[in-house]
Swiss-Prot record:
NCBIfam families listed in its UniProt record: deoC
Annotated Gene Ontology cellular component terms: cytoplasm
Taxonomy, superkingdom: Bacteria
Function, as annotated: Catalyzes a reversible aldol reaction between acetaldehyde and D-glyceraldehyde 3-phosphate to generate 2-deoxy-D-ribose 5-phosphate.
Pathway given in the UniProt record: Carbohydrate degradation; 2-deoxy-D-ribose 1-phosphate degradation; D-glyceraldehyde 3-phosphate and acetaldehyde from 2-deoxy-alpha-D-ribose 1-phosphate: step 2/2
Alphabetized SMART domains for the sequence: DeoC (SM01133)
Protein name in the entry: Deoxyribose-phosphate aldolase
Keywords annotated in UniProt: Cytoplasm, Lyase, Schiff base
EC number per UniProt: 4.1.2.4
Disulfide bonds: none
First-level EC class: lyase
Active site: 89, 151, 180
Amino acid sequence: MSLASYIDHTLLKATATLADIRTLCEEAREHSFYAVCINPVFIPHARAWLEGSDVKVATVCGFPLGAISSEQKALEARLSAETGADEIDMVIHIGSALAGDWDAVEADVRAVRRAVPEQVLKVIIETCYLTDEQKRLATEVAVQGGADFVKTSTGFGTGGATVDDVRLMAEVIGGRAGLKAAGGVRTPADAQAMIEAGATRLGTSGGVGLVSGGENGAGY
């Protein structure tokens, strides 16, 4: 597989304009990235600009804090799907994970899974806030809840993906779901290391630089 085929070309900043999203979509078409990952308000525009291409439209849910109710997440995900999203990247309720309430975390994931049975569901566990044991448990709970992918990070926390975290999560997943590394994938070497550790998708705002052999200094 080419590096481009791993990449969710991402722009989730609050300052993103419609023109920025159009550029993102044009870059995704040009480089044959797997998907664009954008905020929900831009879904219809991205759908139109990507028409006729193989690039998927991914969006976020409960982002970036995960601190809304499961019902709100389910509604947000369903509306995004109805608007044209192919993939949903949801954030778990991090507070429940830190409190050890894994039943609540799993119920949260299941609520979104039920709301969008046809969409690819990626579950963000926000590794920067978790111990290794919590990362293992969060990964397992996400898979049990119906995740198609478990994702390391929002890119808005205190840290992003690390090779060690990707390797740990991959061991827990054991091939039952995909694994998306996001945040901190800045060079082709970073990308390759994440893939070798077990990542099957990469979230980055610097995909063009990665496939061109350069560096992504954008931070996501």
